[in-house]
A protein has these predicted regions:
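Hydrophobic, membrane-interfacing alpha helices
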Residues: 2-239
Length: 239
């Protein structure tokens, strides 16, 4: 009886600790569901399919950030509860590409439509960092313990990015370039903000600097390739 009570108490404590994260993930899933439902004609999907995809999108997103955190620490078991937002950046496109191929939807449309969903979800994850007290900024010299508001700055960055991307995606202006734009902006922002964030690695450059630089370069490369291929004249078939 004592052992059962101990397990029940541990389960209650664990659930209480996860309640803020679960609420934020629910908010992220709700945003994704509404956004997909509004743009369902672009992907030729029913509204109830949009809800199911929103839930799957959120669950897969959580798995990617946790898996990447476990990977970048050299499979350290102590990092199993950690999250790395770069996991979503690098692994979510795999789901988008596979989903487009399996459902026979245009990949450009899929990436454009799902980019705001990705941005909003990682924004919710960063809000959770504030609530859980992790990913803090460095102390500001001479301020008696006040830290750089790196997490808050990142949330503002996401809001501005959503305000810029969503109207353009709605009006179909980006033509598949939404995700590389997100990669370029996020890579540049994270590379700069990491100089003001605490890290488990001593020195000026953190592990996140590398991932941010890779993200930036990949975004620039993909964006440039898409612009180049769009500007190339199509060859007419000779009869």
């Amino acid at each position: 009886m004592t052992l059962r009570f101990w397990f029940r108490r541990k389960a209650v404590i664990l659930l209480q600790d996860k309640i803020p994260l679960l609420i934020l993930l629910s908010v992220g899933a709700a945003f994704t569901a509404v956004w997909l439902a509004l743009l369902r004609k672009r992907l030729n999907m029913a509204w109830y399919v949009a809800i199911m995809i929103a839930i799957a999108h959120t669950v897969y997103g959580v798995l990617t950030v946790k898996a990447f955190a476990f990977l970048e620490t050299g499979f350290d078991k102590a990092s199993l509860g950690n999250m790395s937002l770069f996991g979503g950046m690098f692994l979510m496109p795999l789901a988008y590409w596979l989903g487009a191929k399996i459902s026979k939807r245009p990949p450009k449309e899929v990436f454009d439509v799902f980019t705001p969903c990705m941005v909003f979800t990682v924004m919710c994850a960063r809000v959770n960092c504030i609530l859980s007290g992790c990913c803090c900024g460095l102390p500001i010299p001479g301020t008696n313990g006040i830290r750089f508001p790196t997490r808050e700055a990142e949330i503002v960055f996401y809001l501005i990015l959503l305000a810029v991307l969503c109207p353009r995606i709605w009006k179909e202006r980006l033509q598949g370039r939404a995700y590389p734009v997100y990669m370029m902006c996020y890579g540049a922002f994270r590379f700069i903000i990491e100089f003001f964030r605490e890290s488990d690695i001593s020195g000026l450059f953190h592990r996140a600097h590398l991932w941010a630089l890779i993200t930036l370069l990949l975004g620039v490369s993909i964006y440039a390739e898409m612009k180049t291929s769009k500007s190339k004249p199509r060859r007419r078939k000779q009869s």
